[in-house]
């Protein structure tokens, strides 16, 4: 008789976090709510791979560096208003909001300086190679018209990104067009928000797990966190004037649903098992804007509420014990060509 415990595949847990500006308060609060019951362990230590785009990329990097979700929630609460130019009083905020709307017609709406300062204070001089968990952070190179994905050294081919500053990766993935200026790397590469092509990084993470890491799709468990989903309708004869901001939502929704469909097919979700747990909340159109910091407390409460509701289902799947230690192929004090490929964690 076959011993199933010997032939069972080791299960791998993946965390994916969407982009969405200040709406990232929702998934951060959700994770902070779950973290309260992990006996002091940071929530990121329970995952084998973490992927995040834009604001989700900032959260992903912080978690992979060992920060607690509650620490990152403090970042949103305390620095969010400064990053998005609010907190100066109702009258001043109202005037500045109108000025920024005008500015957005010809250039980026917000100054990226406060965001950089907040990230430098949070991440310091840590590099991607300091991550305790495998990372996947998408950005976009508009000049080369190509994807640009920051990755930890979890495969012998990944010889460069682990030396990049974590702050650079965070600024690149969060450089949302019309909101923040392009982030220029030390090698003069201009990068913009990964949300332009992978705002929901779930499919990206699943493909990485199966191809680069060699993990079978049926061994994967994915916790996918959204930054709210809007309801809206589009008329058959809609033009630019009637669509407005719905155009962006249209493309983002299409990408997200496509990503979820691909991930479900690759993991055998629904037909063979429940592989993907998607956490999101549907709200009316324009009820929550990605740079409106007045909704931070509402988002925080919503995140904690969802955590309380979903914890009984998620705990046995994701939080029974921390993930195995990640051993990168290359380390920061060792040159790639001298490093042993035997350190590969696949």
Outline where the language-model segments fall:
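Conserved small-residue
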Residues: 20, 56, 119, 137, ...
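Extended hydrophobic secondary-structure segments that form protein cores and membrane-embedded regions
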Residues: 14-17, 46-54, 135-140, 191, ...
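C-terminal helical/tail subdomains of lipid-metabolizing enzymes
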Residues: 2, 7-10, 106, 181, ...
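Patatin-like phospholipase
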Residues: 8-16, 22-119, 154, 159, ...
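Active-site gating loop/helix substructures
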Residues: 130-211
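Surface cap/lid and interfacial helix-loop subdomains adjacent to catalytic sites
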Residues: 103, 108-134, 221, 235-267
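Hydrophobic, mid-to-C-terminal alpha-helical segments
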Residues: 186-188, 206-235
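Surface-exposed acidic, glycine-flexible loop patches that form ligand/cofactor-binding
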Residues: 1-8, 39-44, 120-135, 211-216, ...
């Amino acid at each position: 008789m076959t011993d199933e415990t010997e032939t069972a595949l080791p299960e791998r847990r993946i965390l994916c976090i969407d982009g969405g500006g200040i709406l990232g308060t929702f998934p951060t609060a959700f994770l902070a709510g779950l973290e309260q019951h992990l006996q002091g362990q940071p929530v990121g230590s329970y995952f084998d791979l973490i992927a995040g785009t834009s604001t989700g990329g900032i959260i992903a990097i912080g978690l992979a560096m060992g920060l607690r979700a509650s620490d990152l929630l403090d970042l949103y609460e305390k620095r969010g208003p400064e990053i998005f130019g609010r907190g100066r009083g109702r009258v001043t905020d109202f005037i500045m909001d109108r000025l920024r709307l005008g500015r957005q017609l010809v250039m980026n709406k917000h100054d990226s300086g406060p965001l950089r300062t907040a990230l430098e204070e949070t991440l310091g001089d840590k590099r991607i190679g300091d991550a305790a968990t495998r990372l996947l952070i998408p950005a976009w190179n508009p000049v080369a018209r190509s994807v640009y994905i920051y990755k930890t050294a979890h495969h012998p081919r990944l010889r460069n990104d682990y030396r990049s500053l974590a702050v650079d990766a965070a600024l690149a993935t969060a450089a949302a067009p019309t909101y923040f200026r392009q982030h220029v790397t030390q090698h003069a590469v201009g990068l913009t928000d990964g949300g332009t092509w992978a705002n929901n990084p779930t499919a990206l993470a699943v493909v990485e797990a199966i191809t680069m890491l060699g993990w079978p799709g049926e061994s994967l468990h994915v916790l996918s966190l959204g930054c709210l989903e809007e309801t809206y309708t589009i008329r058959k004869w809609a033009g630019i004037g009637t669509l407005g901001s719905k155009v962006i939502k249209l493309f983002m929704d299409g990408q997200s649903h496509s990503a979820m469909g691909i991930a479900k097919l690759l993991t055998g979700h629904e037909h063979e098992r429940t592989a993907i747990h998607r956490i999101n909340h549907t709200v009316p159109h324009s009820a929550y804007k990605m740079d409106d910091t007045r909704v931070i407390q509402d988002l925080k409460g919503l995140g904690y509420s969802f955590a309380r509701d979903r914890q009984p289902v998620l705990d046995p799947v994701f939080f029974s014990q921390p993930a195995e230690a990640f051993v990168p192929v290359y380390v920061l004090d060792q040159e790639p060509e001298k490093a042993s490929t035997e350190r590969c964690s696949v």
